[in-house]
A protein has these predicted regions:
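Positions in alpha-helical segments
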Residues: 18, 78-82, 159
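A hydrophobic, helix-centered structural microdomain
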Residues: 1-59, 169-190
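Adenylate-forming
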Residues: 4-5, 50, 64-67, 139-141
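Cytochrome P450 core scaffold surrounding the K-helix E-X-X-R motif
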Residues: 59-65, 109-115, 150
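The feature captures the short pre-catalytic strand/loop hairpin that immediately precedes
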Residues: 60, 67-76, 151-155
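Residue-level recognition of specific faces of alpha-helices
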Residues: 52, 76-79, 141, 172
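C-terminal terminal-structure detector
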Residues: 123-190
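A short, structured surface patch at a secondary-structure boundary
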Residues: 2, 56, 70-133, 175-183
Length: 190
């Protein structure tokens, strides 16, 4: 991880890490009403800060902020970032999130609050993925690449719900082992 951090720092300006708010596990009992008298806003789970290695030039181009679908040949991605994404090495700092108890190694990928709010309105059962702690890798990630539209998210949701139904230590081990060929075979981002 030190080598990756040095490469990022030597080849582009800005921080080595990229942080962003994501939505974590929703500890309410399933079927409980979404409101909570102590919360002003129901965000569908506990927000947390996710850590990644920075793969894009900071605030470059028209997409300086906000949520955007990942783009093939995105001009914002740095040369080092392209390699990190290809091998999914940009996800390594999420081990910090695992140690903090915010994520597991295996589980549905955590989403940004604004995207989560929109998707749970558009896609039936989307909020059910919050019944488990989010993960660095998951059943959806080894079966499908990055999302580029809502239909991709629907397909990934089917995998996430299947994982939740079958979740066990043995299933997690199987997914971790199946993640290795995805990483080694460069089946990550474009």
């Amino acid at each position: 991880m030190i080598l990756i951090a040095a490469l990022i720092k030597l080849t582009s300006r800005g921080s080595v890490f990229y942080t962003q708010t994501r939505i974590g596990i929703d500890r309410r009992k399933f079927g409980e009403p979404p409101g909570n008298s102590r919360r002003r806003h129901d965000c569908g789970g506990k927000p947390f800060t996710i850590y990644k290695f920075r793969t894009m030039a900071p605030h470059r181009g028209p997409h300086g902020a906000g949520e955007v679908w990942a783009l093939s040949n995105d001009p914002r991605v740095t040369p080092v970032g392209r390699v990190l994404r290809k091998y999914r090495l940009d996800e390594l700092p999420q081990l910090i999130n695992v140690l903090r108890g915010e994520m597991n190694v295996v589980g549905p990928r955590p989403e940004q609050p604004t995207i989560f709010a929109r998707l749970r309105q558009e896609i039936e059962r989307y909020e059910e993925r919050q019944r488990v702690r989010p993960g660095i890798t998951g059943w959806a990630q080894i079966n499908q690449s990055y999302d580029s539209c809502v239909d991709d998210v629907r397909r990934k949701l089917a995998y996430d719900l299947e994982y939740i139904h079958r979740q066990s230590a043995l299933e997690d081990l199987r997914i971790m082992l199946r993640t290795l060929p995805v990483v080694i075979g460069k089946k990550g981002a474009w």
